[in-house]
């Protein structure tokens, strides 16, 4: 049956007049299916001992790599749009659309893992010997995704050698080096956040107003705690308020913030963090609606990559246990489990924004000057 969207929907109309006289490519030629469908070479079959599930293993990983290619394509286009001094609202909408596409692709990749889990550990053992020294650690495209997203080299868990050294191909190494040098999505989003309207000290000066609101909020909390009749409960509440004050100090004191960045506990510059907090507070304002969606999608991407890593870890443990080495010589399960930590979470600061929230009624109201400025559709 032919595709109803490609023609007039009549499978038997041999007299249909072509829409163009140019000779086009047919479906298989356009998609190069002869190459694509001939790329599943089962090593067990070459060894005259074919293992049925090796075919599933190959197909699943090839599908991953195809989707990785699309994610890289989307990331590169998004980085190009963000790498500008001014980003108008139409571009922000396109960035949101493409980030959402990446989110949907990652959801699909997470859902592919259960298909691979239909293979039992014994089935996997039947062909695992053919895989060495190949390893998922050698996926160039996944490393490029990490770098383009913003995973820092110093944040990576080392195993045996530097991650780029597993690639013997010089072209692959050049791709890795270029992806490390080019501005990552993290860096470009940071620059964009630093330009958030309303942060200017000579204008609305959101940061100063926010600090005043936090001081008033904490002071009200102290007054409420002092009225607590039970001494033990009062002391507990006062101690909790002091802890919260220290948490806020970590964002209001630039030196403390910078120390946390150097330690790897924060990613954004101090100015970018201010922008992210402002967008979060005023997300209901039309001007900040799309930026808030953008930040939410970045967290979704981080979350889904973590879920994919987790599913991969669990699958590896089911297939080879937690003591065996991986096929590429890595520590297998132990190495993969270590990648689930926050050090691999690129937009960690966005996840932690909720730490610094204050009640809605305490949020500094926007004045007419900043409201007029927010009508400007570019930033």
Swiss-Prot record:
Reaction catalysis annotation: L-tryptophan + O2 = N-formyl-L-kynurenine
Annotated positions binding substrate: 57-61, 128, 327
This protein's UniProt keywords: Dioxygenase, Heme, Iron, Metal-binding, Oxidoreductase, Tryptophan catabolism
InterPro entries xref list: Trp/Indoleamine_2_3_dOase-like, Trp_2_3_dOase
Needed co-factor(s): heme
Cofactor binding annotation: Binds 1 heme group per subunit.
GO biological process, one term: L-tryptophan catabolic process to acetyl-CoA
Annotated metabolic or biological route of this protein: Amino-acid degradation; L-tryptophan degradation via kynurenine pathway; L-kynurenine from L-tryptophan: step 1/2; Pigment biosynthesis; ommochrome biosynthesis
Entry's EC annotation: 1.13.11.11
Job description of the protein: Heme-dependent dioxygenase that catalyzes the oxidative cleavage of the L-tryptophan (L-Trp) pyrrole ring and converts L-tryptophan to N-formyl-L-kynurenine. Catalyzes the oxidative cleavage of the indole moiety.
Quaternary structure and partners: Homotetramer. Dimer of dimers.
PANTHER family according to UniProt: TRYPTOPHAN 2,3-DIOXYGENASE (PTHR10138:SF0)
Protein name as catalogued: Tryptophan 2,3-dioxygenase
Organism, as annotated: Drosophila sechellia
Organism taxonomic ancestry: Eukaryota, Metazoa, Ecdysozoa, Arthropoda, Hexapoda
Gene giving rise to this polypeptide: v
């Amino acid at each position: 049956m032919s595709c109803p969207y490609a023609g007039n929907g009549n499978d038997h109309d041999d007299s249909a007049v072509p829409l163009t006289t140019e000779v086009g490519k047919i479906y298989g030629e356009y998609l190069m299916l002869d190459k694509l469908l001939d790329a599943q070479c089962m090593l067990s079959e070459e060894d005259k001992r074919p293992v049925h599930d090796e075919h599933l293993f190959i197909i699943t990983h090839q599908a991953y790599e195809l989707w990785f290619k699309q994610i890289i394509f989307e990331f590169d286009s998004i980085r190009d749009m963000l790498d500008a001094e001014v980003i108008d609202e139409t571009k922000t909408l396109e960035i949101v659309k493409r980030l959402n596409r990446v989110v949907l692709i990652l959801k699909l990749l997470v859902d592919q893992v259960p298909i691979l889990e239909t293979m039992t550990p014994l089935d996997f053992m039947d062909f695992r010997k053919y895989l060495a020294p190949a390893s998922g650690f050698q996926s160039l495209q996944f490393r490029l995704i990490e770098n383009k997203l913003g995973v820092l080299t110093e944040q990576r868990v080392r195993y045996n050698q530097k991650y780029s050294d597993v690639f013997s191909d010089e072209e692959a190494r050049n791709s890795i080096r270029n992806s490390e040098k080019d501005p990552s999505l993290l860096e470009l989003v940071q620059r964009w956040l630093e330009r958030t309207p309303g942060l200017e000290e000579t204008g609305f000066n959101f940061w100063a107003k926010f600090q005043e609101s936090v001081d008033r909020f904490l002071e009200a909390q102290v007054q409420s705690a002092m009225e607590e009749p039970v001494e033990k409960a009062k002391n507990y509440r006062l101690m909790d308020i002091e802890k919260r004050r220290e948490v806020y100090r970590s964002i209001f004191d630039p030196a403390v913030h910078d120390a946390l960045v150097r330690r790897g506990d924060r990613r954004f510059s101090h100015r970018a963090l201010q922008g992210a907090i402002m967008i979060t507070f005023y997300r209901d304002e039309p001007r900040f609606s799309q930026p808030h969606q953008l930040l939410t999608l970045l967290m979704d991407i981080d979350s889904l990559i973590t879920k994919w890593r987790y599913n991969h870890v669990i699958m590896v443990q089911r297939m080879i246990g937690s003591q065996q080495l991986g096929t590429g010589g890595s520590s297998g399960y132990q190495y993969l489990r270590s990648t689930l930590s926050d050090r691999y979470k690129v937009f960690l600061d966005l996840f932690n924004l909720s730490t610094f929230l204050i009640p809605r009624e305490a949020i500094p109201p926007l004045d007419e000057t900043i409201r007029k400025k927010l009508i400007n559709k570019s930033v």
